[in-house]
A protein has these predicted regions:
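Well-ordered alpha-helical segments within folded domains of soluble proteins
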Residues: 1-15, 71-81
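Short, well-ordered beta-strand elements within core beta-sheets of diverse protein domains
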Residues: 12-16, 118-122, 160-161
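C-terminal beta-rich recognition modules with glycine/proline-rich loops and embedded aromatic residues
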Residues: 24-33, 38-123, 154, 174-290
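Surface-exposed beta-strand/loop patches in extracellular or lumenal glycoproteins
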Residues: 126-135
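Solvent-exposed beta-strand/loop surfaces of large extracellular or lumenal domains
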Residues: 138-163, 181-185
Length: 290
């Protein structure tokens, strides 16, 4: 967690110096995965290490004080995220992140990144340039002002709305947020927007180490993923997916795809006990010719 918060603050400084939204993308991805994944649900402590596969567990105690550096440094990540959430300078205002919030001149309503939209309501009057960070992963973002769709929205940029604002003007942002596969070596992982997805032993849906069959490509969208109701309050997001899992091709039953469940990485393993196992990278089937 100490490294996570330091990385977030480093990206914050780079964002302020360069104005490049890719650093806001990095803060966002870190915040919703490694950072929130390290935080215990009751807010009492931050985990020292957040592995991509394994368990969540307590950090070491320093100097017999029943706390550690990660729990001490952890709150700085919230300060970084909130400090860069909304910025106003001169004749422009910038939204770097999306969540329900009340800021100077605007209200935002959103369950992002659980949902793929944000709604911004104006409480200001007069000319102002409103800048919206468009994440690099959102290939086809739609922005509307008072119901009218605006021009081309380029991924990985700031979209500027130069407007003479009136009380009650509404901006709607719709992100392109499919589940995407990422391959590395003979392994595959899945993301949805800025969020890494994981399988969790609490779903009780089979062997988490079972390999995926060949054929999944890097950057491939995965249309069989669907958002479902979370099984308990321990999960923030949940998805079902019908996927080619298992290597028993010669068996007609084994050749069928399997339906399994995923959650967001921050929720994975958050029971904080040894029996709660999760996994984000999955083995991909391969042979001696590869």
């Amino acid at each position: 967690t100490c490294v996570t918060t330091t990385w977030m603050r480093f990206c914050e400084k780079l964002l302020e110096v360069t104005g490049d939204p890719k650093w806001a993308d990095q803060i966002e991805r870190t915040f919703y995965n490694a950072y929130l994944g390290a935080l215990k649900a009751d807010g009492s402590e931050f985990e020292a290490y957040t592995p991509l596969t394994g368990n969540r567990w307590h950090g070491m105690n320093h100097c017999f004080m029943h706390t550690d550096c990660c729990t001490a440094n952890g709150p700085r990540g919230f300060l970084c995220f909130l400090r860069e959430f909304f910025r106003k300078k001169g004749d422009s205002a910038t939204f770097n992140f999306y969540a329900s919030a009340l800021v100077d001149g605007f209200d935002m309503y959103s369950l992002y990144p659980r949902t793929d939209w944000a709604r911004i309501v104006s409480h200001t009057a007069g000319p102002l340039k409103l800048r919206l960070r468009i994440p690099a992963w959102s290939a086809k973002t739609v922005v509307k002002l008072n119901g009218k769709e605006l021009g081309y929205v380029r991924p990985g940029s700031y979209f500027t709305i130069a407007h003479d604002w009136k009380l009650g003007d509404i901006v709607e942002v719709k992100f392109d947020m499919p589940v995407v596969a990422h391959t590395f070596g003979h392994n595959v992982a899945f993301t949805r927007g800025p969020v890494l997805l994981a399988r969790d032993s609490r779903f009780k849906d089979g062997d988490l180490t079972e390999p995926f069959r060949r054929g999944i490509k890097d950057g491939q969208t995965m249309p069989t993923f669907a958002a479902v109701r979370t099984p308990s309050d321990d999960f923030w997001m949940a998805f079902s997916a019908t996927l080619p899992i298992g290597s028993h091709h010669e068996n007609p039953e084994g050749a069928n795809p399997s339906t399994v469940f995923f959650c967001d990485y921050a929720s994975a393993g958050n029971a904080w006990h040894r029996n709660n196992y999760y996994r984000t990278w999955f083995p991909n089937e391969w042979g001696p010719t590869e």
